[in-house]
């Protein structure tokens, strides 16, 4: 997902837990699966293959978890009146915020308009009726970017694994997305620090 992650959990002795190394191995495996499915920073991931290697009107088979996240993205697009749109990838990349090379100069109005023509939740179809879900573009150049919710999905995956082990005190963070339960080592609620943004004169936000 092109970001960092941190996991803390407390072994309170109430249940027999696997060794820390085994827990780490399982957590890494779960994250790898999410990356293999939904990371635009990984060239061979499912989402990268869909973005770069499929033509318009060509169904592309995806995993159930990938489909679940896309389905949620479609729902969120509706309830936010389009504020959350996972098809903004072409614009994200144009401005240098995606896995593509960084921005060297401000894009022209023509470039922005061209990329914007590829954006829209109505420009792809998710079909979950078959044995395996499929995604189909209606326009060549459509680029899905699930970074707005895929990290949260990954956080939930890791938290669910910890709870399956019987761990009731944990804090999971992936790229700023958090899920916590219980208390820290001092038996106090987890405290989350939020960095105050600063802006140097002459910089743009």
Give the label of every model feature segment:
Residues 1-205:
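Mature catalytic core of soluble alpha/beta enzymes
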């Amino acid at each position: 997902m092109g970001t960092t992650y941190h996991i803390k959990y407390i072994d309170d002795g109430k249940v027999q837990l696997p060794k820390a190394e085994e827990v780490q191995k399982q957590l890494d495996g779960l994250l790898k699966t999410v990356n293999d499915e939904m990371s635009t920073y990984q060239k061979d991931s499912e989402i990268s293959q869909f973005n770069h290697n499929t033509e318009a009107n060509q169904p592309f088979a995806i995993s159930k978890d990938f489909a679940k996240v896309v389905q949620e993205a479609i729902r969120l697009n509706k309830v936010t009146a389009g504020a959350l749109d996972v098809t903004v990838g072409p614009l994200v990349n144009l401005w240098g915020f995606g896995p593509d090379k960084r921005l060297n100069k401000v894009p022209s109005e023509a470039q922005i308009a061209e990329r914007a023509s590829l954006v829209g939740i109505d420009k792809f179809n998710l079909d979950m009726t078959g044995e395996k879900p499929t995604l189909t573009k209606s326009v060549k150049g459509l680029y899905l970017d699930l970074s707005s919710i895929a990290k949260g999905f990954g956080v939930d995956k890791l938290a669910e694994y910890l709870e399956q082990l019987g761990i009731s005190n944990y804090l999971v963070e992936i790229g700023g997305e958090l899920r916590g339960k219980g208390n820290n080592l001092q038996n106090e609620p987890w405290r989350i620090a939020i960095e105050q943004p600063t802006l140097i004169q002459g910089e743009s936000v």
